[in-house]
Amino acid sequence: ALQRWLPYKSDQFQIICGNDTQVSRSLQAGGKAIVSSTANVQPKVFLEILAAVQAGDTETALQCQQQINRYVDLIVRTNLIANIKASLWLMGIDAGSMRPPQRNLFDDEMNVLQEGMKAIHLLT
């Protein structure tokens, strides 16, 4: 889908990526910005991928993208926003509770998230 818009890129029309699993590809194709929810949890990886793409370091960009994708794979199984808020809480950042009609994670979901974050090295 990104390729379809590249011919229209100009000073008047910039490409912005909103799909966290496509950040590297979008930036390498000339995308100008990222709108990301998971960057709240792993901001350093997003800064690293941006620097790698700007430096032409495709290997590092790929490694960063794989890290982003591992986290996305972990949190898309259930409530995305609740998982992001819970991830931040597990990292010591209080992002507040979910507002109705949404709900916070159940204990078993929180345990799966915590173990998953440890497995992908977002928690120790």
Predicted regions and their residues:
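Structured C-terminal cap/extension of enzyme domains
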Residues: T21-T124
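Ligand/cofactor pocket segment of small-molecule handling proteins
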Residues: A1-K32
